[in-house]
């Protein structure tokens, strides 16, 4: 198990470019299964979760070719013209798919194109209960039969003669009980080649979902309502290949903003596509962090101090996650850690997952003033850089908490060690190398 050793207290300086969006990559890579033609995807991040998904596709017979545009940008060519559906039943597929929560999004495209799919109960971050009902209830409403036994889901829309030529997948009206991003993506892909029109109400409208719909339309799908929570998908008989480029990862953008503030550093975040960042810059500005837009770049100047705003009636600032266009839950951990060295107090409310704030005990060990109110809420009393955090040894519990701990370690006095950094590698590309280029003292210990 690898670790990071970080000597904190160094101010950082320079430019950094966010990787391709992880959450978008997982969706659009699954979508290559919808066609037998070549699909080219640019700006694919070199991270564990994405690489595991690509390995899963190769395991079921998808042809994959990778080229490097430069040392940090990859382009992949996929062709799913010889998919081996029986490989879904193999122990190897079950083992690999279980380790990746994104594997659930294989179901939608396989169901749409081949009429059936099998996937094990997926894993992923241990951040609380993350149910899959939204996915499977929607598929059942479209005519599929879903069974769960021996820790795997079997979904079939085949007619009784068992041939994919007689699929019973029908367009229908779907009112989702939650605006699930992966659930929305799965149902969109399932609906692209269903018979008739599917309407999805309360659809997730994150930029990732917009990008997926945009790509599918280039492939020949007929999707209306892109970017809204009401989607109309008219099923087509066949989809074609296309070229698609991933957005910059907005979670990395937010992480770098928090890192710059905590380490009192000046950093330019390049090519962020500001129009897709939503409330992210605004929320960090509420913490007192200066975020300047320069064209399509964000510049975070070095600040000796930054002060958390209060609401207009004088009450304590409250930052909570919400479905898009609200503040993304993936940045709640970063907002929390950025508040540690601010002046003032803030209530952080993680509404969507009940275990994502449990990492704060490690920050308290480092000297942070945090009160964990309950599994969903924590109050941060800022230190205003009057006291530095101290280096400690800790373990990364999940992707986002791991990076929050890394940011804290970069700002701390002394040496910190973070174990289980495979969690960080799941979502952040070559993060140690990129931080060293900014002046961080960080090394990987295998």
Describe each model-derived feature in a short phrase:
Residues 1-446:
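Short, structured segments at the rim of ligand-binding sites
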């Amino acid at each position: 198990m690898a670790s990071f050793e970080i000597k904190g207290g160094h101010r950082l300086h320079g430019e950094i470019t966010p990787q391709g969006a992880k959450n978008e990559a997982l969706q659009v890579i699954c979508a290559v299964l919808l066609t037998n033609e070549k699909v080219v995807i640019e700006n694919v991040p070199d991270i564990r979760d994405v690489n595991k998904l690509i390995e899963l596709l190769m395991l079921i017979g998808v042809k994959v070719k990778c080229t490097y545009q430069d040392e940090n940008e990859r382009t992949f060519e996929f062709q799913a013209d010889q998919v081996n559906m029986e490989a879904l039943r193999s122990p190897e597929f079950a083992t690999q798919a279980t380790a990746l929560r994104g594997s659930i999004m294989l179901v939608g495209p396989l169901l749409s194109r081949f009429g059936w799919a099998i996937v094990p109960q997926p894993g992923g971050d241990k951040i609380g209960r993350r149910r899959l009902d939204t996915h499977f209830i929607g598929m059942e409403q479209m005519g599929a039969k879903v069974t769960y036994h021996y820790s795997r889901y079997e979904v079939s829309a085949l007619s009784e003669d068992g041939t994919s030529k007689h699929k019973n997948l029908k367009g229908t009206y779907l009112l989702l009980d939650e605006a699930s991003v992966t659930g929305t993506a799965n149902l969109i892909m399932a609906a692209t080649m269903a018979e008739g029109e599917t309407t999805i109400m309360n659809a997730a409208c994150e930029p990732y979902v917009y990008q997926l719909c945009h790509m599918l339309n280039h492939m020949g799908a007929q999707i209306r309502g892109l970017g809204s929570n009401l989607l109309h998908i008219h099923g087509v008989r066949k989809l074609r290949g296309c070229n698609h480029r991933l957005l910059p990862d907005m979670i990395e953008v937010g992480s770098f903003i928090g890192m710059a503030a905590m380490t009192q550093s000046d950093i330019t975040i390049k090519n962020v596509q500001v129009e897709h960042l939503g409330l992210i810059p605004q929320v960090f500005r509420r913490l007192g962090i200066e975020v300047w837009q320069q064209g399509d770049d964000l510049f975070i100047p070095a600040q000796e101090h930054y002060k958390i705003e209060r609401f207009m009636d004088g009450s304590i600032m409250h930052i909570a996650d919400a479905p898009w266009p609200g503040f993304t839950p993936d940045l709640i951990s970063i907002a929390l850690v950025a508040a540690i060295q601010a002046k003032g107090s803030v209530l952080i409310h993680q509404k969507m997952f009940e275990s994502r704030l449990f990492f704060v005990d490690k920050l308290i060990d480092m000297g942070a003033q945090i009160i964990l109110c309950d599994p969903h809420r924590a109050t941060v009393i800022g230190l205003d850089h009057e006291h530095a955090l101290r280096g400690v040894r800790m373990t990364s519990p999940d992707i986002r908490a791991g990076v929050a701990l890394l940011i804290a370690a970069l700002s701390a006095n002394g040496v910190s060690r973070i174990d289980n950094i495979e969690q960080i590698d799941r979502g952040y590309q070559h993060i140690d190398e990129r931080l060293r280029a900014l002046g961080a003292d960080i090394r990987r210990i295998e």
